[in-house]
Amino acid sequence: HCFYNAVMNTNYIEELNESQCAAVTYNDGPSLVIAGAGSGKTRVLTYKIAYLLENGYQPWNILALTFTNKAAREMKERIARQVGMERARYLWMGTFHSVFSRILRAEAKYIGFTSQFTIYDSADSKSLIRSIIKEMGLDEKTYKPGMVQARISSAKNHLVSPTGYAANKEAYEGDMAAKVPAVREIYTRYWERCRQAGAMDFDDLLVYTYILFRDFPEVLARYREQFRYVLVDEYQDTNYAQHSIVLQLTKENQRVCVVGDDAQSIYSFRGADIDNILYFTKVYPNTKVFKLEQNYRSTQTIVCAANSLIEKNERQIRKEVFSEKERGEPIGVFQAYSDVEEGDIVANKIAELRREHSYGYADFAILYRTNAQSRVFEETLRKKNIPYRIYGGLSFYQRKEIKDIIAYLCVLNNNYDEVRFGRIVNEPVRGIGSATLDELNRVVSGMGISYVQAMCESDSLPSLSRKAKVLVPLGETFSELSQHTDDISDGSLIDDILDRFGYREAMQRQGLEGEVRLENINELKSNMITFAKENEGAGLSE
């Protein structure tokens, strides 16, 4: 099937090896591409999409699902180089969560939301769970918010609703064994509170997409018609919910290509289900399997070592990865008796290699599994005067000032957002304590009005009237700025937040630290302007 395509000038024979070429050009049904490490998996996906575009598919009829925004961005850039940006920009390509949130915003009315729904990140979700635990009078030492959040997340990843959870014998026994029988009630309240706040957490983006397609066949039919070919990257990392949605979209026309490697499945603790890739051929009986076994990244020594470990896996799709590179250096294995000794071994090895090969410090990388492990390495490196830089620390979007401004934007977009409102109602400090916030929550819940309306009407509400002097002007400012959420093109909304809510002034009082925080907020503003340029007509909800 490998050929030279004169129309788009792609020479598949020259640019791909035989296995890659076969996987790219097969288009007669479902395909499973088992891609060993360093075997050109991204290359296959990008060429496959280019091949589809060259052979009659329109870009808006192709859906490509990835696990990171970075992977989606890189793929789109590569495809644009092959078929031109004009065609590449219309592809539906992104993470499961970004693509499904786009679908849910378009179809929100079917599932009882507005298109302005808020998306809660993990910290927001945990904060709401903590409030519910407190309201129920439960002991936070027993009902740790992180543990409860993990149980709720696991239920959602298996498409188990609060009602289903309450009726699930396995969940009940698990909760009883862990002495946390109230998890089912927390889950029910959490689900209701998210709906009341017009909010979804990351897991909900999957759950509600599944519900949308399950309960509204006409909507599913529309998206099946639109997505004539579906590609999924890193299939070994999909969970039950993701797999189920892919099945909903592709069961009928069978035009689906999934790429992955069962030997690289490491996310079971986050709900990934290796059975999705192992039993793919049972779910899609007409599947053609392609194996990419040539590793272009590593030496033969490294590849052999990996093969010898993987062959011990009891359940696997057999493959024999090989490399045509030289054998390379043997792999060193050191056993340390403590974390301190481990730090010493690594630091001494760096010093030794620098003496022998005149390497620079930037030629070395230390990889570790958990953030807590960095402490010992840092202490050892400092002791030996070895300069270092830690990557992947606190992310930009986790900084306090960034989360504050995003919370303001979220409340302007969705006046019912309980978690974000709770974060910024007294930020900067304006004398609104937890008692007033609790009362606002009761009013919003009891009267079915928004937080902004509750503040604006607080002078006529007995339980809030004593705080009306602060609440009414605050509510009016929110109300006014909420009218300007359609146009984010110049980022002026962020300036309005800084100036009208006193945030800039509060930062300026913090001296140098405040200046750095304002610079970070400026960076957020630049990101917003760039996003608006790249997504014409986008409003705040996007």
Regions found by a protein language model. Name each.
Residues 176, 374-386, 399, 406-542:
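Conserved helicase C-terminal RecA-like lobe
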Residues 27, 88-90, 109-204, 227, ...:
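ATP-hydrolysis module of ASCE/P-loop NTPase motor domains
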Residues 33, 37-45, 108, 285-288, ...:
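Helicase P-loop NTPase motor core
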Residues 99-107, 263-270, 297-298, 390-413, ...:
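Short alpha-helix plus adjacent loop in nuclease-associated cores
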Residues 14-33, 44, 63-64, 71-74, ...:
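Conserved helicase NTPase motor core
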